[in-house]
């Protein structure tokens, strides 16, 4: 199966702040249960979406504008601390005593930088297409790569390094069609003895086995 591509989301928050006494930048890189319109669909992040990636002690970086050369901290060294709270993904960056670190602290204090973003891969998601023209994607589990104070927001429709919202929706709907194709024979087998349509759990299991088969054959 192809590896999931990186996606980016940005939240503008008044609470992104610089704590002068210990040179720390504090803010939420993600907010739970906030519906964001991405153009082709709406999206929200479920509480607990970051729980596994944090428990796995992934070496997450703190960057400026998602640039690898603009490193501000990392969890491995203890200069970046991440935790889920009632609001979302809280980040605390112990800013470096460098030109970038000092300048960024000044910009945050002045209010010139007031947004934070995060880079991730979607691991588990749910879709609600009760309104096909306005579907909702819920991120249930993500793999976190970096958090970043940003100058400009990075959304899938505007950032060329991320999957577009249109492609994400198309991939989801293609997956649904694949699932339907796999379970059609199952439905036919059951129809002779049982008129009950297989539930989503059955469909998902059938799709998982078929994908495993394709991986082995590939």
What is the role of each PLM region?
Residues 36-42, 48-49, 54, 58, ...:
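Solvent-exposed, flexible loop/coil residues
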């Amino acid at each position: 199966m192809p590896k999931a591509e990186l996606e980016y989301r940005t939240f503008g928050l008044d609470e992104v702040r610089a704590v002068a006494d210990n040179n720390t930048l504090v803010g939420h890189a993600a907010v739970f249960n906030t519906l964001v319109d991405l153009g082709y669909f709406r999206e929200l992040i479920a509480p607990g979406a970051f729980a596994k990636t944090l428990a796995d002690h992934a070496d997450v970086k703190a960057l400026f504008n998602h640039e690898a050369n603009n490193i501000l901290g990392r969890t491995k060294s203890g200069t970046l601390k991440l935790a889920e709270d009632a609001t979302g993904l809280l980040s605390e960056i112990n800013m470096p005593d460098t030109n970038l670190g000092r300048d960024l602290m000044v910009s945050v204090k002045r209010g010139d930088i007031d947004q934070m973003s995060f880079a991730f891969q979607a691991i588990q998601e749910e879709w609600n297409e009760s309104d096909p023209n306005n579907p909702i994607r819920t991120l249930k589990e993500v793999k976190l790569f970096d958090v970043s104070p940003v100058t400009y927001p990075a959304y899938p429709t505007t950032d060329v390094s991320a999957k577009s919202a249109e492609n994400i929706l198309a991939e989801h709907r293609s997956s649904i069609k694949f699932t339907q194709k796999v379970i059609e024979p199952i439905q036919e087998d059951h129809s002779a003895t049982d008129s009950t349509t297989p539930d989503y759990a059955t469909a998902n299991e059938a799709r998982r086995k078929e994908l495993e088969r394709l991986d082995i054959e590939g």
